Curated annotation (Swiss-Prot):
It catalyses: beta-D-ManNAcA-(1->4)-alpha-D-GlcNAc-di-trans,octa-cis-undecaprenyl diphosphate + dTDP-4-acetamido-4,6-dideoxy-alpha-D-galactose = alpha-D-FucNAc4-(1->4)-beta-D-ManNAcA-(1->4)-D-GlcNAc-undecaprenyl diphosphate + dTDP + H(+). It is found in: Cell inner membrane. Transmembrane segments: none annotated. The lineage of its organism: Bacteria, Pseudomonadati, Pseudomonadota, Gammaproteobacteria, Enterobacterales. This is TDP-N-acetylfucosamine:lipid II N-acetylfucosaminyltransferase. InterPro entries: WecF (IPR009993). Disulfide bonds: none annotated. Its main location: membrane. GO terms for biological process: enterobacterial common antigen biosynthetic process; fucosylation.
Amino acid sequence: MTVLIHVLGSDIPHHNHTVLRFFNDTLAATSEHAREFMVAGEDNGFTESCPALSLRFYGSKKALAQAVIAKAKANRRQRFFFHGQFNTSLWLALLSGGIKPAQFYWHIWGADLYEVSHGLKFRLFYPLRRIAQGRVGGVFATRGDLSYFARQHPGVRGELLYFPTRMDPSLNSMAKERQRAGKLTILVGNSGDRSNEHITALRAVYQQFGDTVNVVVPMGYPANNQAYIDEVRQVGLALFSAENLQILSEKMEFDAYLALLRQCDLGYFIFARQQGIGTLCLLIQADIPCVLNRDNPFWQDMAEQHLPVLFTTDDLNEQVVREAQRQLASVDKSGITFFSPNYLQPWHNALRIAAGEAE
């Protein structure tokens, strides 16, 4: 039997760390198909912190792609599970036959599915990537992303799967210590990445609430982002008074980030695609409602779990926010499909499907 190989095809340290730790701590002990990884980027201590995994690192996305293609050609029974897919060479290999459809199983992370970049090289590449995506052996994704993907590629098998957000189920029923009263605190975006459209979001928040709310913007990740942080701060200070605007430019440890989220009353995410599911989960767990773009298909996942959804096009005010908080507080969090530990069984199923052991 050929063991499934997992591929992290782009050097995205935060996401790669989450995936590797999840496999090491949760999946590797029960499945031989959860132990082999090919990773773009440096080791950064992963080998030491994930002893249950066999990890091979590659200095560039191209080097990793070449290694994957060589393995795929050497053994056509070898199957790969691609987690996210931000590697042009791998898509082209699927198009050219270097990797066969039956070898290629893909967990959609959101950004790798949608065509939102306006750069010329992206606009030229998107049609090719779209054709390649129709040739994969199967996809795993959120409910909303499965729906989006199926409209373009109805013949490709799709299975529900959620990114393994680090969550403590014991916090599901823990009431917030502070009383929900007074000035609202609004979280804008889930990172410092430009895909959060911070400037557009800040203007939208100001249009809805004016300078009457506290605005928190976490921008400590990714690194080397100071010019964009300064740009966001300049626009933010033109809209909000200094005491109402908090732009966080330093990377935060998980516990500190969790504490920050629990001080908020509302999450505001203006981007028109599925992303930031980890932050959304942690907010929902703390009875903090989220405002989504209506074009972000994750609202379908939330509605399926009977969670209140607010949209950027809604008329928002404190009364609306407090009512959404009340509705969230009445939901039994232990039954939410995309919460830990409920997302575990779909992962076991995904491993068997990608490995060819399940129909």
